[in-house]
A protein has these predicted regions:
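C-terminal alpha-helical "lid/dimerization" subdomain adjacent to the S-adenosyl-L-methionine
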Residues: 147-218
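Class I SAM-dependent methyltransferase Rossmann-like catalytic core
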Residues: 2-39
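A conserved beta-strand element that flanks and buttresses the S-adenosyl-L-methionine
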Residues: 109
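A short glycine-rich, Lys/Arg-flanked "PGG" loop and its adjoining helix->strand segment in the class I
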Residues: 127-142
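Short catalytic micro-motifs in class I SAM-dependent methyltransferases
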Residues: 112-116
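Short, flexible/disordered intra-domain loops and linkers
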Residues: 119-129
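Class I SAM-dependent methyltransferase SAM/SAH-binding core
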Residues: 48-50, 54-97
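Core SAM-dependent methyltransferase catalytic element
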Residues: 202-204, 219-239
Length: 239
């Protein structure tokens, strides 16, 4: 079960995440399109993104690979109004309870979802994160792939402190939108090592390809990350 603050946060940010032009140069898009070119599917490909906002990434995939069925599963129904293509099926739902049969999708995508799967406490949060990965494993067809993009913090101490400080702020209520400080934000970041370890346990290390790059943060983001150092990690997981 997710903390109530998660929906409140993303309801606040619907307009921000619906702005056009955010995904054309996304490294993850290149990774997915490269996979599709090499795979050479001869049938329609069933692609699903969890937390896809108004569907901009899915639309970019469709432009380059029109022979696909697209599903966007979102916890925020307001995104339905901003959907960028009528060819994208919008489903109100959660990665924790997706409601689809085993092996439904050829490709599954999640971007910066895992650190928002916050429960009522830290233990439940870790359970939610693992459960989401297990659901991805269940939903992907044999021969398919899972693409995970996640912002990580490279200090295990910082990840834990950020969680508890952000949880505390939901009680205190400090809200500075210009500095991306919200009373509705609780985050539980992975380190890149811990993310790879848990994915290896679930999917098998030999099935995972990892790309990572350091993220240069503006000073206020660096402070919010407690100077732990941030990375963008992209995992391609084959089944």
């Amino acid at each position: 079960m997710q903390h109530a603050s998660v929906k409140k946060l993303f309801k606040e940010q619907v307009i921000h995440y619906s702005k056009e032009g955010q995904y054309e140069k996304l490294p993850l898009l290149h990774v997915i399109l490269t996979w599709l070119r090499h795979k050479k599917y001869k049938r329609k490909v069933n692609i699903c993104e969890f937390g896809g906002g108004n569907g901009q990434l899915l639309k970019q995939i469709q432009k380059c690979y029109p022979n696909c069925t697209l599903t966007n599963i979102e916890i925020i129904d307001e995104y339905r109004r901003f959907l960028v293509s009528q060819k994208i099926k919008f489903v109100l739902g959660s990665i924790l309870e997706p409601g689809f049969a085993d092996g439904t999708f050829d490709i599954l995508i999640i971007r910066d979802v895992l650190h928002h799967l916050v429960g009522k406490n830290y233990t439940e949060t870790l359970h939610n994160q693992r459960r989401a990965l297990i659901e991805l494993q269940r939903l992907v067809r044999p021969g398919g792939a899972i693409f995970i993009e996640e912002l990580t913090n490279e200090s295990e101490v910082a990840t834990r402190c950020i969680y508890y400080l952000s949880w505390l702020n939901t009680k205190i209520g400090i809200h500075i939108p210009s500095l991306f400080v919200s009373r509705n934000v609780i985050v539980a970041f992975f380190t890149s090592r811990r993310l790879l370890n848990i994915c290896s346990q679930i999917f098998g290390k030999k099935n995972i390809e990892k790309q990572e790059s350091a993220v240069k943060l503006q000073w206020y983001f660096a402070l919010l990350h407690l100077l732990g150092g941030a990375k963008k990690v992209i995992l391609t997981i084959k089944k």
